[in-house]
Amino acid sequence: MAQETTRDGSDSPSGSVSPPIANGTNNKKDKKSSKKRAHSSGERRSSVSKPARDPSDKPEESPSKKKKRKTTSSTAAAAVPSTITEEVSPSTSVTRSPSPVIDFDGLSRPSRGTRERLEETEAQKQERLDKMKGAVRTLLECIGEDPDREGLLATPERYAKAMLFLTKGYQENVRDIVNGAIFQEGHNEMVIVKDIEVFSMCEHHLVPFTGKMHIGYIPSNAVIGISKLPRIAELFARRLQIQERLTKEVANAIMEILKPQGVAVVMESSHLCMVMRGVQKTTSSTITSCVLGCFESREKTRLEFLSLIGVNR
């Protein structure tokens, strides 16, 4: 009788079947068969019992994808240092936090030059003021005015002091403004402070833009004193700004300070650089927004906020 050589090298009679290599394939088939039987027998899947999801929300990720993303993010975080050292002068360096808007000592960014204003002596303050007065006097002369005439004698000093006031947000401390006014209330519904008057200076032409800001957030149990939201808005407005960045900085600061589920900021303003010069469109307004967290991922939540502040009516 003819013989065949089996996988292990031994001879076996022709026509006989070699024993299976492993039973892994059979086990998989058995599992699939049991799943089909369970489905056909009317057994409920666990996903059916879950509450209905808003179709506009982002789909939930499977546990394996979440685990993979968590591993990736932790690896990326390990590659980024927790603090960043930035050279301020040849003799000193400042260790900066990874925050996009708040520096290591609570000052809001950019704060490299303005930290000097916070720490300077009275003599240094007067020296700064005198330097600014001289610059304003030069501007008056360059436009053809007489800085020594009666109406302009005190203008250089007035303008210098006004400019220091309008940019005082650089040297204000976020921690001092919040002053510990964060309370664990177990509240998880939307909080909105709307129609906050905002005055800022366009960094391109050094003329004002004014308008209203609406701030909303959904807490993660902790709430902030409602007066702190307008104060945070003013802190970032009292500097040279553009509206897009101002909107984003306010949202990022609240997100960092409070760690809520999400933050939404909408601002509508009129820019004098577009009203008094350039295209000279007096009735135009500019609207900007920044949505973070659940306001970004859930359309239903975002639309509720816009409806409550009256934007989409």
From Swiss-Prot:
Toroid-shaped homodecamer, composed of two pentamers of five dimers. Zn(2+) binds at C202, H205, C273. GTP cyclohydrolase 1 is the first enzyme in the biosynthetic pathway leading to folic acid. Residues 1-120 are annotated as: Disordered. HAMAP family: FolE. Signal peptide: none annotated. It catalyses: GTP + H2O = 7,8-dihydroneopterin 3'-triphosphate + formate + H(+). InterPro entries: GTP-CH-I_C/QueF, GTP-CH-I_N, GTP_CycHdrlase_I, GTP_CycHdrlase_I_CS, GTP_CycHdrlase_I_dom. Pathway: Cofactor biosynthesis; 7,8-dihydroneopterin triphosphate biosynthesis; 7,8-dihydroneopterin triphosphate from GTP: step 1/1. GO terms for cellular component: cytoplasm. The keyword Zinc applies. GTP shows a positive allosteric effect, and tetrahydrobiopterin inhibits the enzyme activity. GO terms for molecular function: GTP binding; GTP cyclohydrolase I activity; zinc ion binding. Its EC number is 3.5.4.16. NCBIfam families: folE (TIGR00063), PRK09347.1-2 (NF006825), PRK09347.1-3 (NF006826). This is GTP cyclohydrolase 1. Belongs to the GTP cyclohydrolase I family. PROSITE patterns: GTP_CYCLOHYDROL_1_1 (PS00859), GTP_CYCLOHYDROL_1_2 (PS00860). Residues 11-20, 72-102 have a biased composition (Low complexity). Residues 29-39 have a biased composition (Basic residues).
